[in-house]
A protein has these predicted regions:
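Beta-propeller blade signature
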Residues: 185-193, 245-261, 320-321
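Short, low-complexity, disordered segments immediately C-terminal to signal peptides
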Residues: 36-65
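Surface-exposed loop and turn segments in beta-propeller and other repeat-based domains
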Residues: 139-153, 201-218, 262-285, 330-362
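C-terminal motif of bacterial Sec signal peptides marking the signal peptidase cleavage site
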Residues: 32-34
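Conserved blade-ending motifs and adjacent loop-strand segments that build the rim/top face
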Residues: 404-424
C-alpha cells in the first residue's frame, strides 16, 4: 500500500491510500495521561469518517480456565496473503478467562518461539516469571530487582524480546530503568543447565538512554520481520514534552529505534535507517511519539502497530504497512492524535496520521496488543486487539490496509490492562495489573 499525502493550508499529512476511519469520542480528562487541553481541528469528511461505535460487551471473568481450552501448538509459518475475517464477530460469545493469578504487577507477556509452549511474564519490580501448561513456575526465570528502579508508576522492568533464533542462541533482551533512572537495553543468555533459568551473570548492556523524568520512558521491545530489534522510547516525561524531544533528531527520546544486534561490538546500524549517514542519530527509525508503551508486528503481514499514549485528550494507534519507508513522523508534540497540541509546525512537514484514536471519555492510557493469528477462533483472524489501562476497555480493529476498515469497542473488562501477549499458536492474552492475573480470550462455554 503506497502512502499518499493530504494537505491543508500549511501541513501535509501522510495516510494510507484510502480514507481513514477514526472513532472520535467525547472527552474528559483522567489524571494518568497528563495535564493540558488539546485544541480542536476540523477534518475533511472525504478523508476522515466517523463510524458509529456499537455498545460494548461486559466480559465475564470465571474463576478458572475451562479444560476445553487446550495448550496451544505452534502457529503455521507466515503467508504473504493471510486470510482475514471479513468482519468483527459478535463479542457476546467470548470472554477473557483467567489463566493464572499471583503475579506482582505484570507488565509484559512474551513467548520464546522455541516450541516449548511457555509464556514469560514480566513483573515490574524486576522479575521474569514462566507460565507453563497454565501453571506459574515458582522460581523466576530472571530476577534483577536489585538493578531496577520501580518506585515510580512508569519505571521498572518494562520490556522483553527473545532473539528470533532463541532456540539455538539462547539470547534475549530486556528494557528496564536502572537505579540511576537510566533506560537500559540489556542482553542475557539462558542458563546452560536449566532452560527455565536465565544466567544473571551473562548480562551485557547494549544501550543506555538517560531519562530526564520518571515517566514517559517507553518500554516496548520487539524483533521485526527484518531481524532487527525495535525499541520504543517515550519523550522523557513530565508533561507536554517540555524539552521538545518529539521533533528533535539529536535525541533518542520520543523515537522508535532500530538496531542490528547480530553485528558490531554491541550492535550496528541497519544501512537503511533514515539517519544512518546524516541528519539525525543513526539509531532512529521513526519519531514524534509521546510514549509508545506497546507495539507489535503482524506475524503474517509484517505490518507494525504502535499504541502511543496520549497527553490529556486522545489515545492513538499508528499503523505502518510492511514495506513503508523509514523516517515517519507521528507528530508529537505538534499533534496529540489528530489534534493540534502545541507550537506551530514548520511549513511542508509530513506527519503520519493514526488509524484510530479514542478520547479520554473511554480511557486514559492505551495498551497496544497483537493481531490475532491463532487457529482456535478463525472468526477473529486478522483482528488487532488493544485496550486501555484506566478503563479496561478492549477494542478490535480489522482491515487497516484496506478500504473497509472496521474498529469497535468489544469488551469492558474492568481490568487494569498493562499489556497483551500471544503464545506460540497465536492465541491472545492480556495482563491485569490490579489483580496480578493473566487472562486469555476464548469462547464462552
Amino acid at each position: 500500500m503506497k502512502p499518499r499525502e493530504i494537505t491543508n493550508s500549511r501541513l501535509t499529512f501522510r495516510t494510507a491510500d484510502r480514507s481513514v476511519p477514526i472513532v472520535l469520542l467525547v472527552i474528559f480528562s483522567l489524571a494518568l495521561a497528563g495535564c493540558g487541553v488539546a485544541p480542536e481541528i476540523t477534518l475533511s469528511p472525504s478523508t476522515i469518517t466517523t463510524p458509529a461505535v456499537p455498545s460494548p460487551t461486559q466480559a465475564v471473568l470465571p474463576t478458572t480456565l475451562p479444560s476445553a481450552i487446550p495448550t496451544s501448538s505452534p502457529t503455521p509459518p507466515p503467508t504473504s496473503s493471510p486470510t482475514n475475517a471479513p468482519a468483527l464477530p459478535d463479542p457476546s460469545g467470548y470472554a477473557w478467562l483467567p489463566v493464572v493469578s499471583g503475579l506482582e504487577a505484570p507488565v509484559d507477556i512474551q513467548n520464546a518461539g522455541d516450541g516449548s509452549g511457555r509464556l514469560f511474564v514480566l513483573e515490574k519490580r524486576g522479575r521474569i516469571r514462566i507460565l507453563q501448561n497454565n501453571q506459574l513456575l515458582p522460581v523466576p526465570f530472571l530476577d534483577i530487582q536489585s538493578e531496577v528502579d520501580s518506585q515510580h508508576t512508569e519505571q521498572g522492568l518494562l520490556g522483553l524480546a527473545f532473539h528470533p533464533k532463541y532456540a539455538t542462541s539462547g539470547l534475549f533482551f530486556v528494557n528496564y530503568i536502572d537505579v540511576n533512572g537510566i533506560t537500559v537495553i540489556a542482553r542475557f543468555h539462558v542458563s546452560a543447565n536449566d532452560p527455565n533459568r536465565a544466567d544473571p551473570s551473562s548480562e551485557m548492556d547494549i544501550l543506555h538512554v538517560k531519562q530526564p523524568y520518571d515517566n514517559h520512558n517507553g518500554g516496548g521491545l520487539a524483533f521485526g520481520p527484518d531481524g532487527y530489534l525495535y525499541i520504543g522510547l517515550g519523550d522523557g516525561g513530565s508533561e507536554g514534552d517540555p524539552l521538545r524531544n518529539g521533533q528533535n533528531l539529536q535525541t533518542l527520546l520520543s523515537k522508535m529505534l532500530r538496531i542490528d544486534i547480530d553485528h558490531g561490538d554491541k550492535y550496528s546500524i541497519p544501512p537503511d535507517n533514515p539517519f544512518a549517514k546524516a541528519g539525525g542519530l543513526p539509531e532512529i527509525w521513526a519519531y514524534g511519539l509521546r510514549n509508545p508503551w506497546r507495539f507489535s508486528f503482524d506475524k503474517s503481514t509484517g505490518a507494525l502497530f504502535i499504541a502511543d499514549v496520549g497527553q490529556d485528550a486522545w489515545e492513538e494507534v499508528d499503523f505502518v504497512p510492511s514495506g513503508t519507508p523509514a523516517g515517519l513522523n507521528f507528530g508529537w508534540s505538534f499533534y496529540e492524535g489528530m489534534h493540534p497540541y502545541q507550537d506551530q509546525p514548520p511549513a511542508n512537514v509530513t506527519f503520519t496520521l493514526p488509524i484510530f484514536e479514542y478520547s479520554h471519555s473511554e480511557g486514559c492510557s492505551v495498551s497496544g496488543g497483537y493481531v490475532y493469528r491463532g487457529q482456535s477462533m478463525p472468526e477473529w483472524q486478522g483482528t488487532y486487539f488493544f485496550g486501555d489501562y484506566c478503563s479496561g476497555n478492549v477494542w478490535g480493529l480489522v482491515h487497516p490496509a484496506e478500504n473497509n476498515q472496521q474498529a469497535k469497542l468489544l469488551f469492558t473488562t474492568g481490568a487494569q490492562i498493562t499489556t497483551f501477549g500471544v503464545d506460540e499458536a497465536g492465541e491472545i492474552y492480556m495482563a491485569d495489573y490490579r489483580t496480578g492475573s493473566v487472562l486469555r480470550l476464548a469462547r464462552k462455554q
